[in-house]
């Protein structure tokens, strides 16, 4: 059983938060050093609809920070010049239009507000009928204040909530929903900024496997985390057998090159490839990389591809972001 810890220390406008598994960095969130007009993932804004581009199958909108946003698949030409509510859905390079979406959820510690499924619904992890009945009774007087087009999902963390915690959480959600109103607006406006690192982690704390939380000044120095973080600036990741992988982010995709190093033995390629794919999921997560990923494996027999596919699937299985393995190219990667 791996030991899991959360390390938190003050940093910038908020905190730096690291998830450690067996003393290795497994996830990382760091707040900006200073306030900026950058819209981070999860920010909800009122945007002005500019134009629909048929060839791009989407619509461009104006955002509050003077950048353009892009909504994939949004084709309502009648909304041109209207103000609509969107959420920043992914990190986008500064020279590209920021990808936003009209479909989003608002998470809190015990509930999730959604615009796609009205009514009160429970997480599938809550199987105890008595728990559902207790929560339904507790929130029954508050549900009448929920807008008709809004659904509330009771998270699995509510199962162990103290009396009154779920209803207080729900009341805060309703207050937030009331803020998300673009009626009367004629210009883009930030309606709700995404939570900072510490708030984000503590919000999801009950649903994640955290064993220890350490929050103190200079905690990152005490656990040698800054050294691990500085290593992320290097594209090279060394493996225990002397091999290494090179991870480089381009504008189009993430390139991963696996090398055996000085080992030229018969089993070197397969062993290095297996070690590399086991490490890759962690490296992509702590580097904040995603999207299309192309892996150039060390020379590999076709008969061994099944082993690589299995290890890739296993390595990414616990990632909160679903990863699809598309297959092998004719070039062998």
Where are the regions that the model predicts?
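A short, flexible beta-alpha/helix-coil linker loop
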Residues: 67-68, 118-120, 159-160, 260-263, ...
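Beta-strand/loop nucleic-acid-binding surfaces
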Residues: 28-35, 60, 66-78, 122-126, ...
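SF2 DExD/H RNA helicase N-terminal ATP-binding lobe
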Residues: 76-79, 285-287
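Conserved glycine-centered short motifs in functionally critical loops
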Residues: 3, 57-61, 92-114, 173, ...
């Amino acid at each position: 059983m791996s030991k899991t810890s959360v390390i938190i220390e003050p940093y910038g406008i908020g905190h730096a938060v690291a998830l450690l598994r067996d003393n290795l960095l497994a996830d990382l969130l760091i707040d900006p050093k200073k306030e900026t007009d950058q819209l981070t993932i999860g920010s909800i804004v009122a945007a002005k609809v500019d134009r629909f581009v048929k060839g791009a199958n989407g619509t461009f909108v104006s955002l509050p920070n003077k950048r353009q946003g892009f909504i994939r698949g949004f084709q309502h030409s009648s909304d041109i010049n209207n103000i609509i509510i969107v959420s920043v859905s992914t990190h986008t390079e500064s020279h590209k239009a920021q990808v936003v979406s009209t479909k989003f959820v608002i998470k809190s510690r015990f509930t999730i507000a959604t615009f796609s499924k009205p009514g009160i619904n429970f997480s599938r992890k809550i199987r105890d009928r008595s728990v559902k009945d207790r929560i339904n009774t507790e929130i029954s007087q508050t549900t009448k204040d929920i807008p008709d087009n809004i659904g509330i999902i009771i998270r699995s963390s509510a199962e162990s909530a103290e009396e009154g915690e779920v209803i207080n959480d729900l009341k805060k959600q309703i207050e937030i929903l009331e803020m998300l109103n673009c009626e009367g607006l004629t210009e883009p406006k930030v309606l709700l900024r995404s939570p900072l690192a510490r708030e984000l982690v503590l919000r999801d704390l009950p649903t994640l496997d955290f064993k220890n939380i350490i929050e103190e000044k200079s905690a990152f120095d005490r656990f040698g985390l800054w050294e691990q973080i500085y290593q992320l600036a290097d594209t090279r990741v060394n493996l225990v057998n002397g091999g290494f992988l090179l991870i480089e982010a381009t504008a189009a995709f993430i390139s991963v090159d696996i090398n055996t190093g000085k080992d030229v033995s018969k089993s070197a390629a397969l062993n290095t490839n297996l070690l590399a794919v086991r490490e890759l999921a962690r490296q992509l997560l702590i580097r904040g990389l995603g999207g299309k990923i192309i892996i150039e494996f060390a020379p590999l027999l076709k008969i061994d591809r099944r082993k690589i596919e299995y290890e890739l699937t296993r390595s990414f299985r616990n990632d909160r972001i679903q990863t699809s393995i598309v297959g092998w190219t004719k070039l062998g990667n």
